[in-house]
Amino acid sequence: MIDDDGYRPNVGIVICNRQGQVMWARRYGQHSWQFPQGGINPGESAEQAMYRELFEEVGLSRKDVRILASTRNWLRYKLPKRLVRWDTKPVCIGQKQKWFLLQLIGNDADINMQTSSTPEFDGWRWVSYWYPVRQVVSFKRDVYRRVMKEFASVTMSLAESAPKPQNAPAYRRKRG
C-alpha cells in the first residue's frame, strides 16, 4: 500500500526499559542496527500494525509492553535512489511512519527474534537513549532525531525514577 506521494505507511517502535535505555536490534545477517519497524496492512490501524510487528520482529505481545506515547504526526524519510525499486508499480520512494514508545514490562527473556521463518533481526542490546540517532543509517537519521526528541521527556522521567541496572549483559544473541 503506497500513498499518492510514493510513501509506504509504516510503524516504528522504540522499546525502553525501566532505566530509560532503548532496545537496539541488529538486522539479520548484517552489520546495521535499527529500531523495529514495519508496514501497515490495508484495513489495519497503526496501533494494530505496531502490535503485529512487535510480535513478528521481537516476539513481544501486548502483555509484555505498555504504550507510553506515539508521535503526533507522520514522519517521512526518502530512500536513497539506489534502494528504490523503479520497476515496481506504484514506485515506493520512502516510508511515512507513525512511531510508538513502549516500555517493556515483561522480562528481557521474553524477547525472541525467532518468531518467523525469515527473522528481521538476529541480535539486540540495550543502549543509551540518544545512541541510535548517531548510529542509524544516514537516510533515517532525521526521523530518528525527531522521534527521540518527541519521546525524550517521557523516557527521561522513567529513567529518573528507576533503580540503576546491575551487571546487565551488553549484547544478546537470538534465542533458539
Swiss-Prot record:
NCBIfam families: PRK00714.1-1 (NF001934), PRK00714.1-4 (NF001937), PRK00714.1-5 (NF001938). Residues 6-149 form the Nudix hydrolase domain. InterPro entries: Nudix_hydrolase, NUDIX_hydrolase-like_dom_sf, NUDIX_hydrolase_CS, NUDIX_hydrolase_dom, RppH. It holds the Pfam family NUDIX. One of its GO terms (molecular function) is mRNA 5'-diphosphatase activity. The keyword Transferase does not apply. It comes from the Bacteria. A motif (Nudix box) lies at residues 38-59. Its EC number is 3.6.1.-. Its cofactor is a divalent metal cation. GO terms for biological process: mRNA catabolic process. One of its GO terms (cellular component) is cytoplasm. Belongs to the Nudix hydrolase family. RppH subfamily. It comes from Klebsiella pneumoniae subsp. pneumoniae (strain ATCC 700721 / MGH 78578). The keyword Hydrolase applies. Keywords: Hydrolase. Accelerates the degradation of transcripts by removing pyrophosphate from the 5'-end of triphosphorylated RNA, leading to a more labile monophosphorylated state that can stimulate subsequent ribonuclease cleavage. This is RNA pyrophosphohydrolase.
